[in-house]
UniProtKB/Swiss-Prot annotation:
One of its GO terms (cellular component) is plasma membrane. The gene is ftsK. Keywords: ATP-binding, Cell cycle, Cell division, Cell inner membrane, Cell membrane, Chromosome partition, DNA-binding, Membrane, Nucleotide-binding, Transmembrane, Transmembrane helix. ATP binds at residues 544-549. Its main location: membrane. The lineage of its organism: Bacteria, Pseudomonadati, Pseudomonadota, Alphaproteobacteria, Hyphomicrobiales. Coiled coil: none annotated. This is DNA translocase FtsK. It is a multi-pass membrane protein. The chain crosses the membrane at residues 26-46, 81-101, 114-134, 141-161, 169-189, 225-245. Residues 289-302 have a biased composition (Basic and acidic residues). One of its GO terms (molecular function) is ATP binding. It comes from Agrobacterium fabrum (strain C58 / ATCC 33970) (Agrobacterium tumefaciens (strain C58)).
């Protein structure tokens, strides 16, 4: 009788089965690891950007690659050497990973590796034969450096790199061996297990007899392989459960989740009725779920479902509802778990905003760089014609600022709860529904309880700042929402740089005519405003609040998008410090005006230019500057000449109407932006003239393409008058010293709570106020940009902007003094007054003509220069050197 072998305890084949099982699992894990590595490589290639920092291109920009610096370096190396053939080189590796996962073995592994390398090289040569597209950013071909190197060998025979038909033929010739090598490397050609099966065929045939004899000796070993496999799986499962139990005991974990415990707290059988009468277990689970609960209000309690502790009623009520009640999540519970009657132990579940919809909003990412940044990163050796806009690389790169740990979700959640407690201490009930961290401040949106006035919460700004240990706190109503925004400064403030705004896609793709990068919102989104729609801007703030830096950023924003043919600038800087650095750039219509007297003349010239533009537009029949330029451009493209036929009179002999054809000057009109850095100084010197000119420009200059940016550091009512405020609907307020100044600029308080250094409140035309953090630009950056602009061309100044009109009225002599009063020139009228009345003083001319003191003084000085009156004596009186009207009458 043969010996019996137990499949459970016989280990003859058990070790072999376990070894094969573990080898199979290791191969599968290796396949998955290889597949994950391929996915990372493909992700790095898919997000490859030529402007990312790499071994061949050094820059401080943040890498846009999905894998960061390592992905950018990997993608750059692969694309530089292999080009687009790198994508094809990944295909055999994917086949290897799939084969490993399926448990298939490889034969001739060294040969397949060599075939893979050779196939990648030949594929690069094949792609290098084809011309690169226009958008290809690398200097070599689409086959990379390797493809160009291989193409040098045909160049030795034909004398140059192959192009045209020869290149296409070579590409097709190279494609055939490249495809075969890749298929062989992937195992598609030659098979993976063919030779292994042939090599194992002979040993298998010779062992059939021995296997038959062994089968005859042990007939009961037929199912041994099955039991061995079961033994292997059983051993693995056994050790897995042991390890899992040890981990639970080590870390104090429980087998059932809290959610399962709350859903099915008890098993309803005859042995657990005594346990059901004890509601402590359910209360404990509910309390754990309610650890993060927000304050609830009495008004909301009626609309929420109420849940009572579980109690099992052994005596069922016949009048009970047939349908069992539901819990707070809508699940049907057994009868008796929820009581229909209210009890003392009843509680109301309060849903925290973090459940389902988290109230902590993730900070916004940096603005995505535009195509302009990548385009300017590649140096061009071909000189461009015409005016070239300044490159973004002239601006300072934004620093890599690490997010402050105070902006983590735990800290923000703790601050939200602390703020709720502070408000409750002051008698304000509410809950923080959203927390929006930003680069400078964090916005906490408070949803007040019904009956709480917003003015009451706004008045607690100083108390909130004191209780939260903050420098300042701004409280305002969030437009369009039932929420009050509480803005608290961050401990670590991030600097907003102009480069990340000018180089962003939002700025490049903006459809604004006169786009200006104002800064970032509280959440970190870029703010791009259109000066053409404002149409004028009033900027106010104390010294050191960032007002001058903001003016520089506005000017640079216009310069980075507009050429001198599209936009011209008139700069008025009575302080002679801020805008004088721009003197000499091609965009200027006149040198930077620093004399207040010439500033008045420049504004009056702007008014006359506005009127001339309106005349031109009315003749052509358009309504604004865009329509005028469009009509002119259409005529230039078609080679036409715009004409207009007007009636000039009637023929005396025939009485027929006479017409004349008038031709127009076909020249597009540029936008004109007038920038006044300090309005207070101009108002002190010539307040009446300045206010009148600014009023006319603000009321009428929008359609003519003339816009005014006016800044002042003294936002008082004598500088920002009611007339100016009525014509400047768009305003920006930086930090001010008092609530009165804030109300003067914006019509409400809040600007006194700003942090300075570019922190502003931006009020658009509709009256909506938005907090914006202005970008920073240094003097060195401005100087570099100005130096670059000066190399692009010299400015074409108009002398008439700063020169007063001279109507040759004084040359007619004293004999014509009686006709001076009929002239419209103020100088002629002043001479007529002096010669008629015999009094030559500034105050007398001012009083008689109704003009400003400075204007009258300039007229008196001009009379002295032309010899009509003499210089003032020690008493301030002047002698009239020409005969007066009284002298002429006596003669």
């Amino acid at each position: 009788m043969g010996r019996m072998h137990s499949p459970t305890f016989d280990g003859r084949h058990t070790r072999f089965v376990l070894t094969a099982f573990f080898v199979r699992q290791i191969m599968a894990l290796a396949g998955f690891a290889l597949l994950a590595t391929i996915a990372l490589g493909i992700a790095a290639l898919a997000t490859w950007n030529v402007a990312d920092p790499s071994l061949s291109y050094a820059t401080g920009n943040q890498p846009t690659n999905l894998l960061g610096y390592s992905g950018a370096i990997f993608a750059d190396i692969v694309m530089q050497f292999l080009g687009l053939s790198a994508i094809i080189a990944f295909l055999p590796i994917i086949a290897w990973a799939i084969a490993l996962i399926a448990g298939r073995k490889f034969n001739r592994i060294p040969a397949r590796l060599v075939a893979w390398v050779a196939g990648a090289i030949v594929c690069a040569a094949s792609l290098g034969c084809f011309p690169a597209p226009v958008t290809w950013p690398l200097p070599n071909g689409i086959g990379g450096v390797i493809g160009d190197m291989i193409l040098r060998f045909p160049a030795l025979f034909i004398g140059a790199y192959p192009t045209g038909t020869i290149a296409t033929i070579l590409g097709v010739i190279f494609a055939a061996p490249a495809a075969w090598l890749m298929l062989f490397a992937a195992g598609i050609v030659g098979g993976l297990d063919d030779e292994l099966e042939r090599e194992e065929a002979v040993p298998v045939a010779t062992s059939k007899a021995r296997a038959a004899r062994e089968a005859e000796e042990d007939d009961e070993d037929d199912g041994e392989g099955f039991f061995a496999n079961m033994l292997a799986f059983g051993a693995i499962a056994h050790y897995w459960y042991i390890t899992q139990a040890r981990l639970r005991r080590l870390f104090g974990l429980k087998s059932k989740s809290l959610h399962t415990e709350f859903e099915h707290p008890y098993d309803f059988n005859e042995y657990e009725f005594g346990t059901l009468n004890e509601p402590s277990r359910l209360k404990t689970a509910i309390n754990r779920l309610d650890q993060r609960s927000e304050p609830s209000f009495e008004e909301r309690a009626a609309s929420r479902r109420q849940m009572s502790p579980p109690s099992i009623a052994l005596d069922h009520d016949n009048n009970a509802d047939d349908e069992p009640p539901f819990d707070a999540d809508g699940r049907r519970l057994p009868n008796g778990i929820l009581s229909d009657d209210e009890s003392d132990d009843k509680f109301t579940p309060r849903q925290a905003p973090g459940r389902g919809q988290p109230r902590i909003t993730a900070p916004s990412a940096r603005p995505k760089p535009s195509e302009r940044v990548a385009r300017e990163a590649q140096a061009s050796f071909i000189a461009a014609d015409g005016f070239q806009l300044p490159t973004v690389h002239l601006l300072a790169e934004p620093k890599n600022v690490v997010r402050d740990n105070t902006l983590s979700e735990e800290v923000l959640e703790q601050n939200a709860r602390l703020l709720e407690g502070v408000l409750e201490d002051f008698g304000v009930k509410g809950e923080i529904i959203h927390v929006r961290p930003g680069p400078v401040v964090t916005l906490y949106e408070l949803e007040p309880a019904p009956g709480i006035k917003s003015s009451r919460v706004i008045g607690l700004a100083d108390d909130i700042a004191r209780s939260m240990s903050a420098i300042a706190a701004r409280v305002a109503v969030v437009p369009g929402r039932n929420a009050i925004g509480i803005e608290l400064p961050n401990q670590t403030r991030e600097t907003v740089f102009l480069r990340e705004l000018v180089g962003s896609r939002d700025f490049e793709n903006s459809k604004a005519k006169l786009a200006m990068a104002l800064g970032k919102t509280i959440g970190g989104e870029p703010v791009i405003a259109d000066l053409a729609k404002m149409p004028h801007l009033l900027v106010a703030g104390t010294t050191g609040s960032g007002k001058s830096v903001a003016i520089n950023t506005m000017i640079l924003s216009l310069i980075y998008r507009m050429s001198p043919e599209q936009c011209r600038l008139i700069m008025i800087d009575p302080k002679m410090l801020e805008l004088s650095i721009y003197d000499g750039i091609p965009h200027l219509l006149s040198p930077v005006v620093t004399d207040p007297k010439k500033a008045v003349v420049a504004l009056k010239w702007t008014v006359r230019e506005m009127e001339e533009r309106y005349k031109k537009m009315s003749k052509i029949g358009v309504r604004n500057i865009d329509g005028f330029n469009s009509r002119v451009q259409q005529a230039l493209d078609k080679g036409e000449i715009l004409t207009r036929t007007v009636q000039t009179g009637f023929d005396r002999q025939t009485g027929e109407a006479m017409y004349e054809t008038e031709e127009f000057d076909l020249k597009p009109l540029p936008y004109i932006v007038v920038i006044i850095d300090e309005m207070a100084d101009l108002m002190m010197v010539a307040g009446k003239d300045i206010e009148g000119a600014v009023q006319r420009l603000a009321q009428m200059a929008r359609a003519a393409g003339i816009h005014v940016i006016m800044a002042t550091q003294r936002p008082s009512v004598d500088v920002i008058t009611g007339t100016i405020k009525a014509n400047f609907p768009t305003r920006i307020s930086f930090q001010v010293t008092s609530k009165i100044d804030s109300r003067t600029i914006l019509g409400e308080q809040g600007a006194e709570q700003l942090l300075g250094m570019g922190d502003m409140l931006y009020m658009a035309g509709g009256g909506r106020i938005q907090r914006v953090h202005g970008p920073f630009v240094s003097d060195n950056e401005v100087e570099e940009i100005v130096a670059y602009l000066k190399t692009q061309g010299s400015p074409e100044y108009l002398e008439a902007i700063t020169e007063e009109e001279d109507e040759d009225g004084a040359g007619s002599g004293p004999a014509g003094a009686g006709n001076f009063s009929d002239s419209e020139d103020p100088y002629d009228q002043a001479v007529a007054v002096v010669l008629r009345d015999g009094k030559a003083s500034t105050s007398y001319v001012q009083r008689r003509l109704g003009i400003g003191y400075n204007r009258a003084a300039s007229l008196i000085e001009r009379m002295e220069q032309e010899g009509i009156i003499g210089p003032a004596n020690h008493a301030g009186k002047r002698e009239i050197l020409v005969p007066t009207e009284a002298d002429i009458i006596e003669r």
